[in-house]
Regions:
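Boundary/activation segment at the start of structured domains
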Residues: 1-78
């Protein structure tokens, strides 16, 4: 039974009125804690966290799962 997670954090949005300040930190904190608990964790942060890449990574996470696996998708952003 595998433990797998993806942690996504987006601070920077187009323009500067919609920017956030703690989302990347949140994703990194989650990733660190899940890693301590035995999860295999990947992260997507800021510009690397495009809609297409998020969908691709979640699909990969789900399709690689087998019965009994635990999956976590954590998102911090708008």
């Amino acid at each position: 039974m595998a433990l797998k997670a993806i942690c996504i954090g987006i601070n920077d949005y187009p323009g500067n009125q919609n920017d956030l300040h703690g989302c990347v930190n949140d994703a990194n904190d989650w990733a660190r804690e899940l890693g301590r608990r035995g999860f295999e964790v990947s992260t997507l942060l800021d510009k690397k966290a495009t809609g297409a890449e998020i969908r691709k990574r979640i699909e990969s996470l789900v399709t690689s799962a087998t019965p009994g696996d635990t999956l976590v998708v954590q998102f911090s952003g708008h």
